[in-house]
């Protein structure tokens, strides 16, 4: 198994206090709390933000609309919000590299690591443009984040080439169906942080945490480190990946049941399920339960 130090970060659009409470129940070690979505007063969510910082690695982000965010105020108001958020001592803050406030935020960030980001939700520019973006972000940020939209798989390769190309740790991947593979490849190439959905996707092609864990495990990638913390995280990955695959199997069983029913064919396939049980080996009891669940799903399809 290959160990990588990638930080799996659940992205949370924070509108109300309950959004933070729910996120803290998720099996992820990092939370990006998107406060550009905030509908409540900051004072109302502040205690929960402090609690989140104490329990998880936390990124505070107030994304402007030009780069896919929901912030409706001016830059002066956004800078003021970042100042208040920095009082909570987050591990990271994310500010767009092209934002006029990034220089001031960099001066007051304290111990927080500044992620200087750049997003293009429409296309993937040529490599020379991407390289310029990365260099400019590296000049002000502790980490670089470059995310574009892939219209074809080759677009994703250009973005991935930024990882390791500048002197700062670089997060780089592509959005959209054609770029979905880059979200997994980036982890293998050394991206320090990767982002997953905890229910509500905030970007095209964003994978759920469970789907992402399944993909990493399929490639033999496991959490880095040793001792109980690493083992607990590894177990979260396995549990999440297993739940994702079981849900997918039930969905396929349901679709098969409907098609067979419409065609007048026997709904339940004993031969196929017997093959599954033979392959299950030591996990036969678990898969017997899965088989029975699939049988029930097909019968009611």
Swiss-Prot record:
Active site: residue positions: 119, 145
EC number: 4.2.1.10
Lyase listed as a keyword: yes
Keyword Lyase: yes
UniProt xrefs under InterPro entries: Aldolase_TIM (IPR013785), Chorismate_II_sf (IPR036263), CM_dom_sf (IPR036979), CM_II_prokaryot (IPR002701), DHquinase_I (IPR001381), Type-I_3-dehydroquinase (IPR050146)
The protein's enzyme class: lyase
One of the protein's GO biological processes: aromatic amino acid family biosynthetic process
3-dehydroquinate dehydratase: annotated span: 1-221
SMART domains (alphabetical): CM_2
GO molecular function terms attached to this record: 3-dehydroquinate dehydratase activity; chorismate mutase activity
Origin: domain of life: Archaea
Residue stretches making up the Chorismate mutase domain: 222-301
Reaction(s) the record says it catalyses: 3-dehydroquinate = 3-dehydroshikimate + H2O
Metabolic or biological pathway: Metabolic intermediate biosynthesis; chorismate biosynthesis; chorismate from D-erythrose 4-phosphate and phosphoenolpyruvate: step 3/7
Positions with a binding annotation for 3-dehydroquinate: 32-34, 63, 183, 202, 206
Assembly behavior: Homodimer.
HAMAP family registered for this protein in UniProt: AroD (MF_00214)
Biological role: Involved in the third step of the chorismate pathway, which leads to the biosynthesis of aromatic amino acids. Catalyzes the cis-dehydration of 3-dehydroquinate (DHQ) and introduces the first double bond of the aromatic ring to yield 3-dehydroshikimate.
Family that this chain belongs to: Belongs to the type-I 3-dehydroquinase family.
Protein name: 3-dehydroquinate dehydratase
Organism: Pyrobaculum aerophilum (strain ATCC 51768 / DSM 7523 / JCM 9630 / CIP 104966 / NBRC 100827 / IM2)
């Amino acid at each position: 198994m290959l160990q990588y130090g990638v930080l799996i970060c659940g992205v949370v659009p924070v509108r109300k206090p309950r959004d933070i409470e729910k996120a803290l129940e998720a099996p992820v070690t990092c939370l990006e709390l998107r406060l550009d979505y905030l509908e409540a007063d900051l004072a109302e969510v502040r205690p929960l933000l402090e609690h989140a910082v104490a329990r998880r690695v936390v990124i505070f982000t107030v994304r402007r609309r030009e780069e896919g965010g929901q912030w409706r105020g001016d830059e002066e108001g956004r800078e003021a919000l970042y100042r208040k958020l920095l009082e909570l001592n987050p591990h990271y803050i994310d500010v767009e590299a092209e934002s006029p406030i990034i220089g001031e935020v960099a001066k007051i960030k304290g111990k927080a690591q500044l992620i200087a980001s750049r997003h293009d939700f429409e296309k993937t520019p040529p490599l020379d443009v991407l390289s310029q973006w990365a260099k400019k972000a590296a000049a002000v940020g502790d980490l670089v984040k470059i995310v574009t939209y892939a219209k074809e798989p080759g677009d994703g390769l250009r973005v991935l080439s930024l990882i390791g190309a500048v002197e700062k740790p670089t997060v780089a991947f592509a959005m959209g169906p054609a770029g979905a593979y880059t979200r997994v490849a980036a982890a293998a190439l050394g991206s320090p942080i990767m982002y997953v959905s905890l229910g509500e996707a905030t970007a095209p092609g964003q994978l759920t945490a469970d789907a992402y864990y399944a993909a990493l495990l399929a490639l033999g990638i496991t959490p880095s480190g040793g001792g109980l913390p690493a083992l607990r995280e590894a177990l979260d990955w396995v549990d999440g990946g297993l739940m994702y695959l079981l849900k997918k199997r039930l969905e396929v069983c349901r679709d098969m049941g409907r098609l067979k029913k419409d065609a007048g064919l026997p709904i339940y396939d004993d031969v196929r399920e017997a093959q599954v049980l033979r392959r299950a080996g030591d996990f036969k009891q678990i898969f017997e339960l899965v088989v029975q669940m699939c049988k029930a799903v097909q019968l009611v399809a």
